């Protein structure tokens, strides 16, 4: 889902702003962002990283592992552009085997806005080492002291946001601002929806209860335990510990929910006597895209992306762009209604938590594929991996229970209308 979210953000940014045209590349150098952008990937990564962390990366003064987050992004963006340029120049598989002078890589980073010290630091952090997760995080392999072997396939398909977060997580670096920033962002979000919100600490029976976010809504109290943890990113060991953390988080939020049930004066102090006795619904709220269908260990699991999109509009839609000269028109076809009325209700939200369409889409487009490989002339092995099926209008509709024939007809009708409009405008010389 994180990959889906980034791809959708990239698509939306390109359709709405044509931002890729603003990238200047690395050949002639670049000033630090936002004065210059070396690529569309860099622009998209900075926006997505700010959304993920819930604070502006460009304004952040922290230096996790010795680099600012914008410097992390610029470093990977420059490496990705180097890989693109070099592989494009050699039209054969040999183009993917890149051995570069270390000083040339450092010079490119300095020319593109990093100081000499920061360029050295980035090359060190992006170089393969014993505890590195893989060559996507660390695509540089030192060859002696003067050269770098560049793993071009990893760079060409690099997702900068996930790579930065994964590299930092692998080093045990925690972004100190992200936890509190996420809590504040979610509190502010619910307040903007016109709902009663509380965040507080309380003591009862010698125990402390700390509430990140409690929302009073339509006769219910939603207790959210906010989590800003890195995802496992398909690492089996990390996935195991992530699952353990999910169970622990469910236990935490259930404990908080039980305290509100057992001590109604806590509710009265925050929301008034009229809210006392309301049903309490425990939820774990992740900053990164991680939701589950229905309850797990007695709690719902949702995430900021799914939650904000639920409140954003009453429909889940399929988007189709049409270009008129330099103007991009976006047609959106509704395929699923999220609200029963004109505004979201608590009942609608619970229905969403029971069956998040984002999870339904992801699950319907994942398959397990087996493959074999040779270990020696006489031995082999097999393994299984998840792989993604291609999204189509029909597959999306089938995943969420919409009529694919009806939706495809609507899209085809609008495509014809846009095509006729283009022909008419061209005939008049207005396009």
Q: Where in this protein do the model-derived segments appear?
A:
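Acidic, metal-dependent phosphodiester-chemistry machinery of nucleic-acid enzymes
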Residues: 1-177, 184, 188, 261-283, ...
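Active-site-proximal structural scaffolding
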Residues: 179, 206-207, 246-249
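A short acidic/basic microdomain associated with nuclease active sites
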Residues: 189-207, 216
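Short, flexible loop/turn elements at secondary-structure junctions
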Residues: 201-204, 217, 228, 284-289
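Flexible loop/turn segments at secondary-structure boundaries
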Residues: 206-209, 231-233, 290-292
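Cell-envelope/extracellular polymer assembly enzymes that use nucleotide-activated donors
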Residues: 212
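Active-site beta-strand-loop-beta-strand hairpin of nuclease catalytic cores
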Residues: 215-233
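Catalytic cores of nucleic-acid endonucleases
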Residues: 228-285
């Amino acid at each position: 889902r994180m990959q889906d979210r980034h791809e959708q953000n990239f698509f939306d940014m390109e359709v709405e702003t044509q931002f890729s045209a603003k990238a200047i590349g690395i050949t002639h150098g670049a000033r630090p962002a936002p004065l210059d952008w070396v690529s569309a990937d860099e622009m998209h990564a900075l926006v997505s990283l700010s959304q993920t962390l819930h604070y502006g990366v460009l304004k952040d003064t922290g230096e996790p592992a010795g680099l600012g987050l914008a410097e992390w992004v610029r470093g990977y963006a420059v490496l990705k552009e180097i890989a693109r340029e070099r592989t494009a120049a050699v039209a054969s598989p040999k183009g993917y085997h890149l051995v570069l002078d270390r000083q040339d890589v450092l010079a490119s980073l300095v020319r593109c806005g990093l100081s000499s010290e920061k360029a050295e630091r980035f090359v060190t952090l992006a170089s393969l080492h014993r505890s590195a997760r893989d060559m996507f995080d660390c695509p540089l392999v030192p060859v002696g002291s003067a050269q770098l072997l560049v793993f071009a396939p990893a760079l060409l398909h690099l997702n900068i946001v996930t790579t930065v977060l994964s590299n930092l997580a692998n080093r045990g670096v925690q972004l100190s601002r992200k936890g509190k920033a996420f809590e504040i962002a979610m509190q502010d979000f619910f307040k903007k929806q016109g709902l009663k919100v509380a965040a507080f600490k309380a003591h009862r029976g010698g125990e402390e209860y700390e509430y990140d976010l409690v929302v009073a809504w339509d006769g219910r109290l939603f207790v959210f335990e906010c989590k800003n943890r890195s995802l496992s990113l398909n690492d089996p060991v990390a996935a195991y510990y992530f699952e353990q953390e999910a169970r622990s988080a469910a236990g935490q939020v259930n404990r908080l929910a039980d305290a509100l049930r057992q001590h109604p004066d806590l509710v009265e102090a925050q929301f008034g006597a009229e809210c006392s006795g309301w049903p309490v619904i425990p939820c774990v709220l992740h900053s990164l895209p991680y939701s589950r269908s229905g309850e797990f260990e007695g709690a719902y699991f949702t995430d900021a992306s799914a939650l904000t999109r639920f409140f954003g509009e009453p429909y889940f839609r399929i988007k189709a762009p049409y270009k008129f000269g330099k103007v991009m028109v976006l047609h959106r076809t509704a395929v699923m209604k999220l609200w029963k009325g004109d505004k979201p209700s608590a009942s609608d939200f619970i229905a969403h938590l029971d069956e998040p369409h984002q999870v339904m889409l992801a699950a319907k487009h994942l398959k397990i594929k087996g493959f074999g490989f040779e270990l020696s002339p006489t031995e082999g092995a097999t393994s299984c991996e998840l792989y993604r099926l291609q999204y189509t209008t029909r597959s999306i509709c089938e995943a969420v229970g919409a009529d694919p024939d009806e939706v495809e007809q609507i899209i085809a009708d609008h495509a014809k209308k846009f095509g006729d409009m283009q022909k008419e405008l061209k005939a008049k010389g207005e396009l």
